[in-house]
């Protein structure tokens, strides 16, 4: 449901769950007004975390890119789908269990951080299998995860984005590779860490709580993104208020005619809306 507020959103909410591409940056370039708006919100006491379906980029690498925009960012503030997926698996299997990992080094490291044993063969009899974005994947690696899943390993994935934009055009994304395993085994993943599932926002709330502090209540969190079918839908599924910005893929026409499950709580042309009184209408 669309809302309006008499206070700036950065004062009305304690925790901002910010998408990255199309909101904070486009590729290597910062989105206009984004960094200054984030700094202002943090100056008012808002905590900011950055959420991304990308499962291959290390948190430290993303943090360094954001520091290049003059943002004060620590790696823990970057919540990738690998971080979320590894935590999901760790809660589902015994400590020290064998987990087949098909993904980039970042995913392998996150699984190992959870006290799980990373394996590369179905012959190791893993109790779980996790698949993430891995453009260098071989046929044999894909076959191995299919064997593991077919043998009963619980199947997790980092995200189900079917496509990924590249300089030369649209390429198959993680979801397309996952479909190959589903088609081979007939088994659907039990969980996906990436948006539009709400797990990423739920884990971000937990990770923002330090030194035994209670997590910020959902009602005090604001999900911010440019994509209705990922960022905003994840907020709606999880019960989070959301802010849609028009600096990425969504245009005013799509916002006006979005079905209910894709409608944001607030709308702004860019992240300056984070520090302004927010209204529900768009000026076209």
Descriptions of predicted regions:
Residues 5-8, 116-127:
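Short acidic low-complexity segments
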Residues 224-257:
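Acidic, Mg2+-coordinating phosphoryl-transfer loop and its flanking beta/alpha structural elements
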Residues 12-27:
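Asp-based phosphoryl-transfer active-site loop
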Residues 280-284:
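Conserved small/polar residues in nucleotide/adenosyl-binding loops
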Residues 192-231:
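Conserved Lys-Pro-Asp/Glu-containing loop-to-beta segment of HAD-superfamily phosphomonoesterases
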Residues 1-15:
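Positively charged, low-complexity intrinsically disordered leader regions
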Residues 17-18, 29, 38-65, 78, ...:
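Substrate-recognition element of Asp-dependent hydrolases with the DxDx(T/V) motif
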Residues 44-121:
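Active-site phosphate-binding/coordination module
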């Amino acid at each position: 449901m669309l809302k309006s507020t008499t206070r700036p959103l950065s004062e009305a909410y304690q925790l901002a769950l910010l998408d990255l591409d199309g909101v904070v940056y486009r590729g290597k370039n910062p989105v206009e007004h984004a960094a200054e708006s984030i700094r202002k919100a943090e100056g008012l006491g808002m905590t900011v975390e950055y959420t991304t379906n990308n499962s291959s980029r290390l948190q430290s690498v993303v943090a360094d890119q954001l520091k290049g925009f003059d943002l004060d960012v620590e790696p823990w503030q970057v919540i990738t789908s690998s971080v979320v997926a590894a935590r999901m698996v760790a809660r589902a299997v015994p400590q020290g269990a064998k987990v087949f990992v098909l993904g980039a080094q970042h995913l392998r490291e996150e699984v190992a951080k959870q006290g799980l044993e990373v394996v590369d063969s179905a012959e190791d009899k893993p109790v779980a299998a996790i698949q993430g974005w891995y453009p260098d994947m071989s046929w044999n690696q894909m076959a191995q995860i299919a064997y593991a899943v077919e043998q009963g390993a619980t199947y997790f994935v980092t995200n189900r984005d079917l496509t990924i934009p590249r300089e030369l055009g649209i390429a198959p994304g993680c979801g397309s590779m996952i479909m190959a395993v589903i088609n081979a085994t007939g088994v659907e993943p039990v969980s996906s860490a990436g948006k539009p599932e709400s797990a990423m926002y739920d884990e971000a709330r937990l990770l923002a709580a330090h030194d035994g502090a209670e997590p910020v209540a959902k009602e005090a969190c604001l999900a911010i993104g440019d994509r209705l079918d990922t960022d905003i839908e994840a907020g709606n599924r999880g019960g989070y208020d959301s802010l849609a910005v028009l600096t990425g893929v969504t245009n005013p026409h799509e916002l006006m005619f979005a079905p209910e499950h894709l409608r944001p709580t607030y709308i702004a042309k860019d992240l300056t809306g984070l520090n302004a009184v927010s209204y529900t209408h768009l000026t076209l």
